[in-house]
UniProtKB/Swiss-Prot annotation:
The keyword rRNA-binding appears for this protein: yes
Highest taxon, organism lineage: Bacteria
Protein name per UniProt: Small ribosomal subunit protein uS15
Family matches, as InterPro entries: Ribosomal_uS15 (IPR000589), Ribosomal_uS15_bac-type (IPR005290), uS15_NS1_RNA-bd_sf (IPR009068)
Keywords of the record: Ribonucleoprotein, Ribosomal protein, RNA-binding, rRNA-binding
Organism: Acinetobacter baumannii (strain AB0057)
Family annotation (PANTHER family): RIBOSOMAL PROTEIN S15, BACTERIAL AND ORGANELLAR (PTHR23321), SMALL RIBOSOMAL SUBUNIT PROTEIN US15M (PTHR23321:SF26)
The keyword Transferase belongs to this UniProt entry's keyword annotation: no
UniProt record similarity statement: Belongs to the universal ribosomal protein uS15 family.
GO cellular component, one term: cytosolic small ribosomal subunit
Function: One of the primary rRNA binding proteins, it binds directly to 16S rRNA where it helps nucleate assembly of the platform of the 30S subunit by binding and bridging several RNA helices of the 16S rRNA. Forms an intersubunit bridge (bridge B4) with the 23S rRNA of the 50S subunit in the ribosome.
Subunit structure: Part of the 30S ribosomal subunit. Forms a bridge to the 50S subunit in the 70S ribosome, contacting the 23S rRNA.
GO terms assigned for molecular function: rRNA binding; structural constituent of ribosome
């Protein structure tokens, strides 16, 4: 099931660097991670949904690009974000 507006607002409030911050890499990565985790359950029930799997791979690649950018820009923020989201890298 897709993220609700309340879920999005909660994630944005948790990872925002300033009020009304929706564009920082931390917020974008957190939202992508929530969407990716949501799709994991979908694929357990629908193994042959290749069209949606392509969208999942695109989201994972976008998250990786944002994480690489953040790692090069500010390594401390990167490690804090990885720890907060429970991602391995």
């Amino acid at each position: 099931m897709a993220l609700t507006n309340a879920d999005r607002a909660e994630i944005i409030a948790k990872f925002a660097r300033a009020e009304n911050d929706t564009g920082s890499p931390e917020v974008q990565v957190a939202l992508l991670t929530a969407q990716i985790n949501d799709l994991q359950g979908h694929f357990k029930a629908h193994k042959h949904d290749h069209h949606s799997r392509r969208g999942l791979i695109r989201m994972v690649n976008q998250r990786r690009k944002l994480l690489d950018y953040l790692n090069g820009k500010d390594h401390e923020r990167y490690t804090a974000l990885i720890g907060a989201l429970g991602l391995r890298r």
